[in-house]
Amino acid sequence: MSDISFNAIPSDVRVPLTYIEFDNSNAVSGTPAPRQRVLMFGQSGSKASAAPNVPVRIRSGSQASAAFGQGSMLALMADAFLNANRVAELWCIPQGNGTGNAAVGEISLSGTAGENGSLVTYIAGQRLAVSVAAGATGAALADLLVARIKGQPDLPVTAEVRADSGDDDTHADVVLSAKFTGALSAVDVRWNYYAGETTPYGIITAFKAASGKNGNPDISASIAGMGDLQYKYIVMPYTDEPNLNLLRTELQERWGPVNQADGFAVTVLSGTYGDISTFGVSRNDHLISCMGIAGAPEPSYLYAATLCAVASQALSIDPARPLQTLTLPGRMPPAVGDRFTWSERNALLFDGISTFNVNDGGEMQIERMITMYRTNKYGDSDPSYLNVNTIATLSYLRYSLRTRITQKFPNYKLASDGTRFATGQAVVTPSVIKTELLALFEEWENAGLVEDFDTFKEELYVARNKDDKDRLDVLCGPNLINQFRIFAAQVQFIL
């Protein structure tokens, strides 16, 4: 046999002359960047062309509208995601209707305008302005508002006018119906969101949400439809316990050492402080992050899509860098009076809920993004998986470690240290792997992902398995780099 382990050149060749093969095991230096693949759950509309529970690669908002129906939850989510992140490989998996009915509520318009102006209505965060002339009645404005709604097909609702059945001929109702049925088909309706917007004197507006409670669709078929493809990040619009439990089980299996197709889910819950706090302490998921928003002008699924778009892009660039101050482009913050106070946000961060703040330009930005993991199996406080950066960094370290071994030693022989073999032989020993891991740690350290090389080197243990001589066991303890989040100082001044 040759001293060199050839891959394709046989040792029993007699035909002249030259035989040259290529080996790419040493071609790559460093670690190739992992693909930023994202999966988005969401409901399609009645005019969807895409089959339910089957992932579809989406590259534009118009493609999403054609696949899932214009104004559907999933089409709006995909458009919001792509507006914030055009680098990611976005896949969408549609669900059909949930339980309940399509009724959203009624907008009541009445009275007579005493001045010229504009009636500015916001439905699901979309602005609908109607010109108002002095003397116009609420009933006339209802017709104009419905025309504006019908002219804005990206709205998640349809509208019809219902005239007053009583004696008030200035009054009419605008009846709103959702384009999909489920717990998230309810929408926010308000007037005059921005400064300077006022309802003309004499016009009376009101909104009455539909009674009853709808339910989300079951995502079990969609989870089965995910297959074995790895999705690094998942946009999860549903926050009901059965669906979150299904997703948690799937993510934990993918996170395990056999599957290694780890992913991380992002969701948003809109509600009161009490609702959000109660929800947070009811969960304990290290692979799910939830941001809480009170008084949200837009549907929660749009915030979830944008939050995941921003976070996934930033963490793909540097998994260890904190996400604080990153803006959520296009998302409308709650009114000032609806925003959580400092003490409320601090408490929510102990309840497993991520927080946001609003900068002076009126833009929503991430304040701190955490996982929903709070306690260990004994119920004691456990911050080990608190930060999303920990999950993202661990995911990258495992990916780069696995890639280094599969790239450099794809089909090597295994021998004990001290074995004498030719330099060109495809043989690996514990000391060879240990040297490779130390070199890899230095790459991690240079990238700002880990620290304390000396301790890592001292504690690194590489040995052949005593029961399986084809197996190499490694015990290593990388010290993950931390994030600069808190600065505390005491100024002892002198007069």
Curated annotation (Swiss-Prot):
Locations listed in the record: Virion; Host cytoplasm
GO annotations of cellular component type: host cell cytoplasm; virus tail, sheath
Any one biological process term the GO annotation gives: symbiont genome ejection through host cell envelope, contractile tail mechanism
Main localization, broad class: virion
Keyword annotations of the record: Host cytoplasm, Late protein, Viral contractile tail ejection system, Viral genome ejection through host cell envelope, Viral penetration into host cytoplasm, Viral tail protein, Viral tail sheath protein, Virion, Virus entry into host cell
Pfam family, one: Phage_sheath_domII
Description of the deletion phenotype: No tail is synthesized.
Induction record: Expressed in the late phase of the viral replicative cycle. Expression of late genes is activated by the viral late transcription activator C.
Subunit-level organization: Homomultimer.
Family: Belongs to the myoviridae tail sheath protein family.
Free-text function comment from the UniProt entry: Polymerizes as an extended helical structure around the baseplate-tail tube complex. During ejection, the sheath shifts to a contracted form, thereby making the inner tail tube protrude through the host cell envelope.
Name under which the protein is recorded: Tail sheath protein
Source organism per UniProt: Escherichia phage Mu
Designated gene of the protein: L
